[in-house]
A protein has these predicted regions:
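Short, intrinsically disordered low-complexity segments
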Residues: 33-73
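Conserved short beta-strand edge segments in small beta-sheet-based binding/regulatory domains
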Residues: 70-113
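Short amphipathic alpha-helix segments
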Residues: 12-38
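Extended Gly/Ser/Thr-rich low-complexity repeat segments
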Residues: 19-28, 62-82
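Short glycine-/aliphatic-rich beta-strand segments at the starts of folded cytosolic domains
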Residues: 1-17
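Broad gene-expression machinery/nucleic-acid interaction feature
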Residues: 4-6, 51, 98
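Classical N-terminal secretory signal peptides
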Residues: 1, 113-115
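A structural detector for beta-sheet-dominated domains
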Residues: 8-12, 41, 55-57, 85, ...
Length: 115
């Protein structure tokens, strides 16, 4: 079974943010010669926000890390997932997407309370 990195996304505009995220990840797939390595779920709307999950195959992230090498290693965060989250957040900011990103497993840990 393939390992995936699941990222919680919170955004005020689902269509704009999911289209932007789809564009970022499609370009990433093209860059590392992969296809169909991510999934974006439908959103749940609450309190004026859309909440959804972006699931990315870890192979895609590993290939990104290998391709950009040292600059990936210099990204903030410990480990592959955190560094990818930093890279992904930078990409969304460059596209001016108004979205908050967090690793799903961390959101569910007791460190952040009980969910």
């Amino acid at each position: 079974m393939e390992e995936r990195i699941n990222i919680n996304v919170s955004a005020t505009n689902y269509d704009q943010s999911s289209d932007g995220i789809r564009s970022i990840l499609t370009k990433l797939e093209e860059m590392v010669h992969e296809e169909n390595e991510f999934v974006i779920t439908d959103s749940e709307f609450a309190f004026g926000w859309h909440f959804y999950i972006v699931s990315v195959n870890k192979v895609l992230v590993e290939k990104l890390a290998n391709q950009i090498g040292e600059s990936f290693q210099k990204l903030k965060g410990k480990g592959l997932e955190k560094k990818f989250l930093t890279w992904f957040s930078q990409q969304t900011q460059e596209k001016n997407l108004k979205a908050k990103l967090a690793i799903k497993e961390e959101m569910e840990s007791s460190k952040y309370g009980i969910f």
